[in-house]
A protein has these predicted regions:
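Glycine-rich phosphate-binding loops of NTPases
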Residues: 111-173
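A structural signal for short, well-ordered beta-strand segments and their strand-loop junctions
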Residues: 141-144, 220-224, 281, 365, ...
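Short, surface-exposed beta-strand/loop "edge" segments at domain boundaries and coil↔beta transitions
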Residues: 29-40, 104-115, 179
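Short acidic, S/G/P-rich loop/turn micro-motifs used as interaction or catalytic elements
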Residues: 77-78, 146-150, 178
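Conserved P-loop NTP-binding catalytic core
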Residues: 2-5, 13-16, 52, 73-138
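Switch/communication elements of ASCE P-loop NTPase nucleotide-binding domains
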Residues: 2-87, 307, 317-435
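Extended helical coiled-coil dimerization/tether regions that scaffold
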Residues: 2-34, 44-47, 174, 178-344, ...
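Short beta-alpha junction loops
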Residues: 146-147, 175-176, 400-402
Length: 435
């Protein structure tokens, strides 16, 4: 903040107050409907945690112990609580081997303990069933690029919605675009996540991530587009889209996108039409493939956001039929489909995390980020996330089999929990920092 002191005739620069961080302190599990298990993520009494920085918690253990199920159950727990708190509807939990039945967390400088009672069909907050206060729910980002991804996705391709269409949940995994595992779909959804960034300083972190990976802070998007006949004006553009919807849009997803676009106000539609005209001009100049160059710097961020948003809408409506994204390394142009899957996956993960971290109380769930990554790259995952989320108060809960992630954690900002199954059931063990 900048203020002027009229007495001393000087300009005073005041630091912005630090945002209160979100921290998940405890997860209570019900295992096989009989055993209660606590996962302790709280700070140790003799250690110092800076809540204004991102916190890391790792869940480690052998295959089949239930690490991924725990992450999924955290999402379902907060979805259930949201429905109960806002709509007074209690949802009976589908019987699973592992269920989250309680969480303790820090948000907005306060401590909250939320638990559910299946017998009473109630939620309790700080041991009270009178929910007459403004209880913050974390903004959850879920990311997984494995073939057996278990995270739920929103229904974003029709007028109907599912229970995960809530403002506090974002899925940024490989199935984000169309519920299938597709490299090209993941790539274009990454552009959508870029569009969701509102603050310039947050967008410029994308530039920093590219540099950290060894790439230049620029990209080129090439695309082929569908030429609409006899479209010379905005009115003609709208009429052509209506005709597309009535005659040619047999795919329900595309039809929904067309309906959604046509329902927007005139100003928004004119912006997209302007981008379409730019594409037509390149085609009129004899170019079969159109391209856009994006430089991530302070002066061009806003115009790039507008261009990308409009291109994304044109792609959704089927007017852009093919896209390719190119990155640059040492002056050489590299097709993004040719970069390593590990690089692409982690870049998409961090971009998704950034989009949610602009909001308060961000909880980022990442399932086995080491998948498809060489051991040398695994050693950089934590550094990669630290770089992208530097100065952002959030909590990352990560499941992993990689000892490289454990060894690279920042002291006093991280916890490691070992999960194991014995003849007595599930065992949760907090690993000491000095181990």
């Amino acid at each position: 903040m900048v203020t002027y002191d009229p007495i001393k005739h000087i300009i005073l620069f005041e630091e912005e107050p630090k945002r209160a961080g979100f921290r998940l302190d405890k997860i209570e599990l019900l295992v096989c409907n009989s055993q209660m298990v606590d996962i302790d993520l709280s700070r140790q009494k003799d250690s110092f945690f800076d809540d204004s920085l991102c916190q890391f918690s790792l869940l480690i253990g052998v295959n089949g112990v239930g690490k991924t199920t725990i992450l999924r159950s955290i999402i379902d727990f907060f979805i259930d609580f949201h429905e109960y708190y806002n709509h007074d509807g209690y949802r009976m939990t589908t019987r699973k081997n592992i269920q989250v039945v309680g969480v303790k967390y820090q948000a907005n400088g306060n401590s909250y303990y939320v638990c559910k009672n299946e017998n009473e069909k109630k939620f309790y907050v700080n041991d009270s069933d009178i929910l007459n206060q403004n209880i913050p729910i974390p903004n959850i980002v879920a990311s997984c690029f494995g073939v057996f991804d278990k995270f739920p996705i929103k229904n974003t391709m029709s007028l109907s919605t599912n229970r995960y269409n809530v403002p506090f949940y974002t899925y940024v995994g490989a199935r984000a675009a169309n519920n299938t595992f597709s490299a090209s779909s993941s790539l274009f959804h990454m552009l959508y996540n870029l569009l969701s960034l509102k603050k310039t300083e947050t967008i410029l972190k994308v530039r920093d991530i590219l540099k950290y990976m060894g790439y230049e802070d620029r990209m080129r998007l090439t695309c082929r587009f569908k030429l609409l006949a006899n479209v010379q004006s905005f009115r003609g553009f709208v009429q052509a889209l209506k005709k597309e919807m009535d005659l040619g849009a047999s795919v329900s997803r595309r039809r929904w996108y067309l309906e959604n676009f046509l329902s927007k106000d005139k100003n928004d539609k004119q912006k997209v039409f302007s981008t379409y005209q730019d594409l037509r001009k390149q085609a009129d100049d004899g170019l079969s493939v159109c391209h856009y160059d994006f430089q991530f710097n302070q002066s061009q961020v806003q115009s790039h956001k507008d261009d990308l948003r409009n291109l994304y809408l044109l792609k959704q409506m089927g007017l852009i039929t093919q896209t390719k994204l190119f990155l640059y390394k040492n002056g050489e142009q590299i097709n993004s489909l040719d970069i390593s899957s590990g690089e692409l996956n982690m870049f998409c993960t961090v971009v998704g995390a950034l989009s949610a971290s602009e909001m308060e109380n961000a909880l980022i769930l990442i399932d086995e980020p080491e998948i498809s990554q060489h051991p040398n790259w695994q050693m950089s995952i934590i550094d990669f996330l630290n770089k992208g989320l530097e100065g952002i108060p959030c909590h990352l809960l990560i499941t992993t089999h990689s000892h490289f992630l454990v060894s690279d954690l920042t002291r006093n900002r991280s916890t490691v929990t070992y999960l194991n199954k014995t003849h007595e059931g599930l065992v949760s063990e907090r690993i000491k920092e000095e181990t």
